[in-house]
Curated annotation (Swiss-Prot):
This is Aminopeptidase 2. It comes from Candida albicans (strain SC5314 / ATCC MYA-2876). Glycans are attached at N92, N229. Optimum pH is 7.2. Optimum temperature is 30 degrees Celsius. The active site is at E364 (proton acceptor).
Length: 924
């Protein structure tokens, strides 16, 4: 699944990839980039049938029951096939259904337990005999059917269930998605089963290892479109203007990948692939699916070739769903998307949106093999799905669109997202033990998406991309239609490469965090490298520093990059192969760690960057490492400022993006400091970018490359945000023309920045104008940009209006609540207002976004992590100490870590930052 994290650090990303993972221009604080489980966050998980050693016999019925470490179903039966018929009833937002599940009986038993949530069972039969002993466990989300007679071992049992449920508005299970058409609210019925919401749609064995076949039928009004995972088998007319559409039986798949949709839909098709490709959307928007359909055709061909396995399903439908919590969902053969991540006017979209849509489509299609065809055994293997799909989307994009140079962006995007979150004490290993269903959504974060993909990139660099992809192909062929553990992938890569991948990667996947590698120059052409755990707060305890990672040092010298040297102990001495005093650790930034040099080496590397001795990835990594080391206290922030000041002539967009992000993180940390320091930092920012901004300007032409467009838009956004008079004046003038009817006055690449700037300086009239754009947009992209800008207003009475909209789901969709919150986080008044809103409306928020869904943790993080002071942190702790933290406890812990890190940073460096700005004459 693609995360709903919409940060546009580079436009090609991640939150993410349930984060991926969307639409933000810049998060001022780098720390928060990781915390929108992208959706950016994604969904996927529960638990699997345990090993025999983890079972015990219950004395009353002899059925194998899993120990309570993990909430999974008994293994006395195994589902083989579901024959499911379901009908949505839009008049009262309910649905009714019936199913017959074929089970293989593994042992003599007199009961079957299934997952069920908010489902009313009206009737049940086992092998045609009525079942009346039916009990529910709301806490475990199960229903148990107890029979008069035992089922015999080895037999096939048929359990018939007739049921009803709510066509809910929670964007989970079988739910209703609303949209406007001709001023009227209309609905479609759609599904989101991942991670554990198939149980909301029909009673099921809702665990990823319980793969079954499904024959699905939908009953609906004749004029509505019905879709499911497989192609249509037959349609039968029913009384009352109804029809029953039955679909072909699916191949083996997990319940979280089941999908069905009923609605008034139109489609555009692409015939450039061997199976039909269609993009569905609400009437009048279908033409906006052409770009994604073309991307899909190219991508499926590419993956067929790379994996050596043809796309495994009989069609590909991609559907834009108007109410959708994640970025996208990889249901077999029926992929669902947020509208903004599928539909695009390619001729009028900004470059970051185009890149985002491309990445999301590629990510979901990679899942059709990696996740759907071959599926994780249980949910602590989530990263297998998400990390690989993220890596594969970058790999495919680099192959199909080499001019985009996405691996350069990767270092500033996925890698930094991963390192940022994993530097928190409240992070988690790539492989996470999951006990309860309400814990699952919390691990749809940058660790699953970005650290997972970063680890795979590191392996691919070590083994070579061709060998890596060959190993993956072998893995898919060996395990197709089955389930796997992480070790299965490592073994396949070991066999393909001859390297001991299992030994190396077990350490990376099963331990929290990553190291900082300190480089000491000891003379005689030798350096000593030492690894310790890195924390954003800079206060690692001895007990937290036990893991020794296999660190691929990637020693770069004038002779190239030596990939053979690995640091597996605490320290190691290395003889440099050259005597010209040029070296850098982590060449091309392939490794997952930070590097700390002696002060003189930072200066020399800064000079090497200017002289062209460092690759784009090296330069990005150097800035990122300096920024992270400054915020955590390993170096002074003035050293970071010295480095970026020396690179004012930098020409690469990705490097500039990292520079501006790091300055943004300083600004966020200083948010509650004195105005003089903040004003001086703005003056420095304007001076830093002035020469390059004058060179590039912000006019766009048909001759501009992808990178040219990104650089112009990024520099303009930073100039306007730093109150550059010329940029601000242009933003105001362009907006006035736009409001007056000149729709060409705002270039798509500048739209978000211009909206934000006008909001920042705007009044009630400006708010009304942006609100009108939001309610009557010309594109989804324009709608999102207007919504995000709401948070940029600074007048208290307008901020009251903005926060007043957050819980009005008829105006701001539940899925979009975080978008104006991102804007509010950009300034001091907004951060304070956001906390006031969160604390005063908590009970209502908790009802709207219950902990079992993925968005509550994101809202908690957004509403709290903008703070920078210990007294503010204490206020947050005291508030949540009185609340039930279930379902968002990890997000809260991470947010508190973020506040601590910023508090320590400002206590340590605020004075020296001002002194540096003063010494460089930025305080006038």
């Amino acid at each position: 699944m693609a995360s709903n994290n919409t940060s546009q650090r580079s436009g090609f990303s991640s939150f993410f990839c349930r984060l991926k993972t969307y639409f933000c221009n810049h998060f001022l604080c780098l720390f928060v980039l990781s915390f929108f489980p992208l959706s950016f966050r994604r969904l996927c998980l529960l638990c699997h049938l345990c090993e025999k050693s983890n079972l015990w016999l219950s004395s009353d019925n002899s059925a194998s029951v899993v120990k309570q470490e993990r909430e999974v179903l008994p293994t006395n039966v195994k589902p083989l096939h579901y024959d499911l018929t379901i009908e949505p009833i839009f008049d009262n937002f309910t649905f009714k259904g019936e199913e017959t599940i074929d089970f293989q009986v593994n042992e003599k038993t007199n009961f079957i337990t299934l997952n069920s949530l908010e489902i009313e069972v009206q009737e049940a039969k086992i092998d045609g005999k009525s079942v009346t002993d039916i009990s529910f466990d709301a806490g475990k989300q199960t229903v148990t059917f107890k029979f008069d007679d035992d089922l015999s071992t080895g037999s096939i049992a048929k359990l018939y269930i007739k049921f009803t449920g709510e066509l809910n508005d929670k964007m989970a299970g079988f739910y209703r998605a609303s949209y406007q058409e001709d001023g009227k609210t209309k609905y479609m019925a759609t599904t989101q089963m991942e991670p554990t919401d198939c149980r909301r749609a029909f009673p099921s064995y809702d665990e990823p290892a319980a793969k079954s076949k499904f024959t699905i039928s939908l009953i609906a009004d004749k004029e509505l479109v019905c879709l499911s995972n497989s192609s249509e088998k037959e349609t039968v007319s029913l009384d009352g203007n109804k029809k029953k559409v039955t679909f072909q039986t699916t191949p083996l798949m997990s319940t979280y990948l089941v999908a069905f949709i009923v609605g008034d839909l139109r489609y555009i098709s692409n015939d450039n692939y061997r199976v039909p490709i269609r993009v569905y959307s609400t009437p009048g928007t279908e033409h906006l699916g052409e770009y994604s359909a073309n991307i899909a055709a190219q991508t499926l061909k590419f993956f067929d070739q790379q994996f050596g396995i043809d796309y495994p399903y009989d069609k590909l439908d991609m559907v834009a769903v108007p109410s959708f919590s994640a970025g996208a969902m990889e249901n077999c053969g029926l992929v669902t998307f947020r509208t903004v991540d599928l539909l695009i006017d390619a001729d009028n979209a900004n470059v970051n949106t185009k890149q985002r849509v491309t990445e999301v489509v590629m990510h979901e299609l990679a899942h059709q093999w990696f996740g759907d065809l071959v599926t994780m055994e249980f949910w602590d293997g989530l990263w297998l799905n998400e990390g690989f799909a993220t890596w594969m989307s970058w790999y495919a994009c680099n192959s199909l669109y080499p001019d985009w140079k996405v691996w350069e962006s990767y270092v500033s995007d996925s890698l930094q997202h991963a390192l940022t979150l994993d530097a928190l004490r409240a992070s988690h290993p790539i492989e996470v033990p999951v006990k309860r269903a309400d814990e699952i959504n919390q691990i749809f974060d940058a660790i699953s998406y970005s650290k997972g993909s970063s680890l795979l990139r590191m392996i691919s660099k070590w083994l070579g991309e061709d060998v890596f992809v060959k190993g993956v192909s072998n893995y898919l062929k060996k395990h197709k239609w089955g389930n796997t553990k992480t070790s299965d992938l490592w073994e396949a890569l070991s066999e393909a490469s001859g390297e001991d991948v299992v030994k190396v990667m077990d350490i990376w996947t099963k331990n929290i965090g990553f190291p900082i590698v300190k480089v000491e120059e000891i003379g005689n052409g030798e350096i000593k490298v030492t690894q310790n755990r890195f924390l954003a707060t800079g206060d690692v305890k001895e007990s937290e520093d036990k893991t020794l990672y296999p660190v691929f040092l990637g020693l770069k010298t004038s002779e190239g990059v030596d990939e053979s040297s690995v640091l597996e102990t605490r320290s190691k001495t290395i003889k440099l192969p050259t005597s010209d005093d040029f070296f850098k650790i982590n060449g091309d930034q392939s490794g997952i760690y930070r590097t700390a040099y002696e002060p003189a080496r930072w200066t020399k590397l800064g000079k090497a960057g200017v002289e062209g001795k460092l690759s784009v990835e090296d330069r990005v990594g150097l800035v990122a490492d300096a920024g992270s080391l400054a915020s955590s206290g390993f170096i002074k922030t003035s050293s970071l400022l010295d480095l970026v000041k020396s690179w004012s002539k930098e020409s690469n967009y990705v490097v500039w993006n990292e520079i501006l992000t790091r300055i943004g993180s300083i600004k966020a940390a200083l948010m509650f400091e004195d105005e003089a320091t903040k004003k001086a930092l703005e003056i420095f920012t304007r001076d830093l970018i002035s020469e390059k901004l004058k060179e590039t300007g912000w006019e766009f032409s048909a001759d501009d490359s992808f990178a040219d467009q990104q650089l112009k838009s990024s520099l303009f956004a930073s100039a306007a945000n730093a109150e550059d008079p010329e940029a601000v004046a242009f933003a105001k003038e362009a907006f006035a023309k736009f409001i007056a009817g000149d729709k060409k006055a705002i270039h798509p690449n500048l739209r978000a920045s211009i909206f934000n700037t006008n909001a920042k300086y705007g009044d009630e009239k400006t708010f009304d104008e942006l609100y009108n754009i939001y309610r009557n947009p010309s594109s989804v992209e324009e709608k999102i940009a207007a919504l995000r800008s709401f948070g940029r207003f600074t007048k208290p009475e307008i901020l009251d209006k903005v926060t007043g909209l957050l819980l009005q789901t008829d105006i701001v969709k539940q899925q979009d609540i975080y978008i104006p919150m991102q804007g509010l986080r950009a300034h001091k008044l907004g951060v304070e207002k956001l906390w006031t809103w969160l604390s005063e409306n908590w009970d209502q928020i908790y009802i709207l976004l219950p902990p079992g869904l993925s968005m509550l943790g994101s809202v908690v993080t957004l509403g709290t992590s903008g703070f920078t002071k210990e007294e503010q942190k204490k206020k947050v702790e005291e508030f949540f100490a009185q609340k039930d933290n279930k379902g968002y406890d990890q997000s809260l812990a991470q947010s508190l870590d973020i506040i601590t890190a910023k508090s320590k940073w400002t206590d340590r460096d605020a004075k020296s930052i001002y002194e540096w700005l003063e010494a460089n004459e930025y305080t006038k």
